[in-house]
Amino acid sequence: MITGLITKIIGSRNDRYLKKLRKVADEINKLEPQMKALSDEELKAKTIEFKERLASGESLDKILVEAFAVVRNASERVFGMRQFDVQLIGGMVLNDNKIAEMRTGEGKTLTATLPAYLNALSGKGVHIITVNDYLAGRDAKWNAKLFEFLGLTVGINISGMSGDQKRAAYAADITYGTNNEFGFDYLRDNMAFEAQQRVMRSLHYAIIDEVDSILIDEARTPLIISGPTDGDATLYTELNTVIPMLTQQDKEDTEEYIGEGDFTVDEKNKQVLLTERGQEKVEVILQERGLLDENQSLYSAASISLLHHVNAALRAHTLFEKDVEYIVTEKGEVVIVDEHSGRTMPGRRWSEGLHQAVEAKEGVQIQNENQTLASITFQNYFRLYEKLAGMTGTADTEAFEFQSIYGLETIVIPTNQAMIRKDGGDLVYLTEQEKYQAIVDDIKPRLEKGQPILVGTVSIEHSELLSDLMDKAKIKHSVLNAKFHAKEADIIAQAGALGSVTIATNMAGRGTDIVLGGNLEARLDKLGDVSPKEIEAEKELWKEEHKKVLKAGGLYIVGTERHESRRIDNQLRGRSGRQGDPGESRFYLSMEDSLMRIFASEKVSNMMKKLGMEKGEAIEHPWVSRAIENAQRKVEGRNFDMRKSLLDFDDVSNEQRKVIYQQRNGVIDSEEITETIEQIWDDVFHNCVNEYVPPHSLTEQWDLEGLEQRLKADFLVDLPVRQWSIDDANLQEGSIREKVVEHAKASYLAKKEQVGPAIIGSFEKSVMLQTIDTLWKEHLAAMDHLRQGIHLRGYAQKDPKQEYKRESFELFLQMLENLKREVVVILSKVQVQSKEEADVIQEQRRQAEAKAQLEMKHAQVNKGEVVSDENTGDDTFVRNEKKVGRNEPCPCGSGKKYKQCHGKLD
């Protein structure tokens, strides 16, 4: 109460901040006459002037007022549109490393041109990030006219581009692209073998459009580059037949309650757990089929992989429903449906064997599992930028998360014109059937007066169910869901047309404005090549229809179910009432809806019982709306905790990733790594000697024979260490260490002299990079295994996060030691007699790189989701010749086994 009183007197932080920016906007407005007086050439020349002023030491803040005035005037000349004062304020918020919440239709795309221009003047590059290729292409094409008029270059970074095309895109002053593509390019650059293979510049400034979608909804979905592993698809098929033999139990076993089912389903946390009875039943079935040894448990160390497959099959059958979480295409592919947008995600795959389990369940071809080669979460990728900003229509409900995780403050920008949309209260019915019938009954009279209607559903299944009801009621409508992805923008653009009814899955079509009366440009395009008179007639017709739609009450939004997040509901409502237009919205709910059933059922159902509701009756009361909102807050809090927990774990691997990538880039960018190799050489041989001749030890503790054998076996260094001890009775361990290192170095230096420092230097870099990549890949797999079982430490009264940090650090230190040793082993054993043979080895390495089969993936941790854009991946490598076995003779003709020769380089 006191806080509210103080806010009323001095205003909120948001109000005070906006008040300060309004003063700056007034200064920009004062420059308008001056800018209008300039010719096109004089206005363009301002860009060169600003760059010179920055080069001489002026800050961006000093030139902001003038730069914004230049962009505003250029926008008017190029587009015939000028930024409103609220858009100037939005631009300043973005420049100030904050999130601008701007309502739908307030011109976020035009707002972003202001800070993009200002920050591009530094020459370090600006990235404008959107959620899909369509929006990236559309915005780049449109805004390029403005930026090129002002003398700046624009690039576009989308899937399927070559390395040269991407380098050109990143070299531009302003680059548009998707979050996936920027993230994958970062990972690919850090897997490159040569500096010229990289495509990106430094990560300077990013503006994220629909920032809530990317930094919140996709925060749990790391980007992964992976390669195939040797998996057995038959196990998935076998286990798929086991699950139908199990029965579900309503709740978990406790001391007081022992059920008769085999597994329980926790819808709230999206988990399935075998009961003790179920575990025993599954073990018996698996033992009968020869998949599990007798007297062995599913939970024994040797059966962990089998348990992993059983859990995946259980989840596939109980938590993942066809036409809700995924669809099956005509080609027999299981394609994931994005739970937030309702779009299909071709090429993306769930991880942890879940996708294979779903494929087995649907009876389609089962693809192999993959091994992670490189990964990063969006949370950690975007925190790499020096400056980061974002814009969206719905950020305020997630302001705390933006601030605590990304350090981004959310500023709510006022609308240019007052919002007059009427938001009706929630109507709650007992059953889904009653709810859908009520929606159809509500739509009929509104259609008679020509009011356009947009119906939002949560799944493909529900959109098709509602579509069938409308067909029976003879209501003409369009359906937009994951199955009609290509028509998305067109359908949404015409959703505001007179008398149109559109059913859309969740927030499909986000980023496309719904104009009352329909999209005029699209209507004119359909006319084709017609006379100016016909074009004018079409425009007049559109104006008439626009007036009728306004009179009918504007766009009516119908929500068929509350989402887990209030923000998603607000996004749906936000499609109506743009730029001061009239509009209406209402949510229809039932006690059978997921959110109501799982989170809000008890309170609301008790309320409905007290009211004595009958079939077909609905309840509308502020108490009900409050109960639903409280349920949503609970879910939002739980989801935030999950994302925060993910970040805590990923921060551990993120620090390790930085070290590895820094090492790789240091190797690539150095002309030679002689000093690094010498240091590694000293460390490895010192450690080797210390194992057999411990420091400050007695002669009796020495194992000189073991040292000789180790030096010869691992490094091909044949030294008479025992003879040294016989020849010199006073020989100290320090002297042994020095002599071993000296002889080993001399042997390697002789090899370098033989082929020349340039060739061996290039070879050293190649060995170093390939060894880093191999061990990093193995380390990522070890980290995955560690993480999957770390929660069990809680039962031993230990903090799983602290244990994960400690053990992963130990694994990392061990990996760094292994890296040094592996490099020295390979360099010691390699036999290069001539320049020609060195060239052969280099060529083999290049061929290996060319054949590398990589898949870009995007994995959702809470559901085990992995995503791969099939347009970005290389074609699958098919081996034409027999693979060389590790113990077979090396094909180079050296006479050695493959694993001891060129197999070391694989």
UniProtKB/Swiss-Prot annotation:
<keyword id="KW-0813">Transport</keyword>
<comment type="similarity">
    <text>Belongs to the SecA family.</text>
</comment>
<dbReference type="GO" id="GO:0008564">
    <property type="term" value="F:protein-exporting ATPase activity"/>
</dbReference>
<dbReference type="GO" id="GO:0017038">
    <property type="term" value="P:protein import"/>
</dbReference>
<dbReference type="GO" id="GO:0005524">
    <property type="term" value="F:ATP binding"/>
</dbReference>
<keyword id="KW-0547">Nucleotide-binding</keyword>
<feature type="binding site">
    <location>
        <position position="892"/>
    </location>
    <ligand>
        <name>Zn(2+)</name>
    </ligand>
</feature>
<dbReference type="Pfam" id="PF21090">
    <property type="entry name" value="P-loop_SecA"/>
</dbReference>
<dbReference type="GO" id="GO:0005829">
    <property type="term" value="C:cytosol"/>
</dbReference>
<dbReference type="InterPro" id="IPR044722">
    <property type="entry name" value="SecA_SF2_C"/>
</dbReference>
<comment type="function">
    <text>Part of the Sec protein translocase complex. Interacts with the SecYEG preprotein conducting channel. Has a central role in coupling the hydrolysis of ATP to the transfer of proteins into and across the cell membrane, serving both as a receptor for the preprotein-SecB complex and as an ATP-driven molecular motor driving the stepwise translocation of polypeptide chains across the membrane.</text>
</comment>
<feature type="compositionally biased region" description="Basic and acidic residues">
    <location>
        <begin position="876"/>
        <end position="886"/>
    </location>
</feature>
<dbReference type="GO" id="GO:0031522">
    <property type="term" value="C:cell envelope Sec protein transport complex"/>
</dbReference>
<dbReference type="InterPro" id="IPR014018">
    <property type="entry name" value="SecA_motor_DEAD"/>
</dbReference>
<keyword id="KW-0963">Cytoplasm</keyword>
<feature type="binding site">
    <location>
        <begin position="105"/>
        <end position="109"/>
    </location>
    <ligand>
        <name>ATP</name>
    </ligand>
</feature>
<keyword id="KW-0862">Zinc</keyword>
<dbReference type="InterPro" id="IPR027417">
    <property type="entry name" value="P-loop_NTPase"/>
</dbReference>
<protein>
    <recommendedName>
        <fullName>Protein translocase subunit SecA</fullName>
        <ecNumber>7.4.2.8</ecNumber>
    </recommendedName>
</protein>
<keyword id="KW-0067">ATP-binding</keyword>
<dbReference type="GO" id="GO:0005886">
    <property type="term" value="C:plasma membrane"/>
</dbReference>
<dbReference type="Pfam" id="PF02810">
    <property type="entry name" value="SEC-C"/>
</dbReference>
<feature type="binding site">
    <location>
        <position position="513"/>
    </location>
    <ligand>
        <name>ATP</name>
    </ligand>
</feature>
<dbReference type="InterPro" id="IPR036266">
    <property type="entry name" value="SecA_Wing/Scaffold_sf"/>
</dbReference>
<feature type="binding site">
    <location>
        <position position="902"/>
    </location>
    <ligand>
        <name>Zn(2+)</name>
    </ligand>
</feature>
<dbReference type="GO" id="GO:0065002">
    <property type="term" value="P:intracellular protein transmembrane transport"/>
</dbReference>
<dbReference type="GO" id="GO:0043952">
    <property type="term" value="P:protein transport by the Sec complex"/>
</dbReference>
<keyword id="KW-0811">Translocation</keyword>
<dbReference type="InterPro" id="IPR020937">
    <property type="entry name" value="SecA_CS"/>
</dbReference>
<keyword id="KW-0479">Metal-binding</keyword>
<dbReference type="InterPro" id="IPR004027">
    <property type="entry name" value="SEC_C_motif"/>
</dbReference>
<dbReference type="Pfam" id="PF07517">
    <property type="entry name" value="SecA_DEAD"/>
</dbReference>
<feature type="binding site">
    <location>
        <position position="87"/>
    </location>
    <ligand>
        <name>ATP</name>
    </ligand>
</feature>
<dbReference type="GO" id="GO:0006605">
    <property type="term" value="P:protein targeting"/>
</dbReference>
<dbReference type="InterPro" id="IPR000185">
    <property type="entry name" value="SecA"/>
</dbReference>
<keyword id="KW-0997">Cell inner membrane</keyword>
<keyword id="KW-1278">Translocase</keyword>
<comment type="subunit">
    <text>Monomer and homodimer. Part of the essential Sec protein translocation apparatus which comprises SecA, SecYEG and auxiliary proteins SecDF-YajC and YidC.</text>
</comment>
<keyword id="KW-0472">Membrane</keyword>
<feature type="region of interest" description="Disordered">
    <location>
        <begin position="860"/>
        <end position="906"/>
    </location>
</feature>
<dbReference type="InterPro" id="IPR011115">
    <property type="entry name" value="SecA_DEAD"/>
</dbReference>
<dbReference type="InterPro" id="IPR001650">
    <property type="entry name" value="Helicase_C-like"/>
</dbReference>
